[in-house]
């Protein structure tokens, strides 16, 4: 997702953080709670805190925010209101550097969320167990003991998710990358990942 940012005035009420805030538009990120990864969207941030849009209830545990360029920040939840939550950074951050680095096309990449889930694939008319390792809007990573060929068509079955038709896009046996024939919208991906991580909807 592309992002834009604008400086805003002090936030009212529970969102007041003192430092100058920047409104961030369409910047996806990962919320990491006790090692489990969830999709979120940055809404505004300052040197001392950040407001996130969530797609599920707030998870419990020690938390970090990971941006698409790989930067990670330890955060602490301060409030939650519907599908938005406010967090405080464990230490102040350089907001301008953070945003400018995130806008660098060489640093920007699609959010890929790590999961660990048993699944099955159907290939060449046969069903085989696999291990799902990550999920994005347009693909997945799996571990499969059966050799797969690049560009081979497969069907991936994961718990309550819909059937996923995909092609093998890279092979490093036993690890393989799949690209879906039809991808997910942001909200769909967030919901599926939260369910796979054992987190109910908000």
Predicted region positions:
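Structured alpha-helical
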Residues: 1-202
């Amino acid at each position: 997702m592309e992002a834009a940012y604008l400086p805003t005035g002090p936030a009212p009420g529970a969102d007041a953080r003192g430092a100058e805030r920047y409104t961030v538009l369409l910047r996806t990120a990962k919320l990491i709670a006790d090692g489990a990864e969830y999709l979120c969207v940055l809404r505004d941030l300052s040197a001392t805190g950040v407001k996130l849009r969530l797609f599920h209830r707030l998870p419990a545990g020690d938390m970090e925010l990971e941006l698409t360029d790989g930067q990670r920040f330890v955060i602490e939840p301060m409030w939650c209101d519907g599908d938005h939550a406010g967090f405080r950074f464990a230490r102040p951050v350089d907001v301008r550097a953070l945003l400018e680095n995130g806008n660098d096309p060489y640093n920007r990449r699609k959010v890929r969320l790590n999961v660990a889930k048993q699944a099955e694939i159907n290939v060449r008319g046969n069903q085989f167990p696999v291990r799902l390792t990550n999920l994005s809007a347009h693909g997945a990573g799996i571990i499969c003991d059966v050799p797969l060929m690049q560009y081979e068509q497969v069907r991936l079955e994961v718990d309550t998710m819909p059937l996923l038709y995909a092609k093998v896009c890279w092979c490093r046996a036993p690890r393989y990358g799949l690209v879906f024939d039809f991808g997910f919208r942001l909200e769909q991906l967030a919901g599926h990942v939260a369910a796979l991580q054992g987190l109910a909807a908000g």
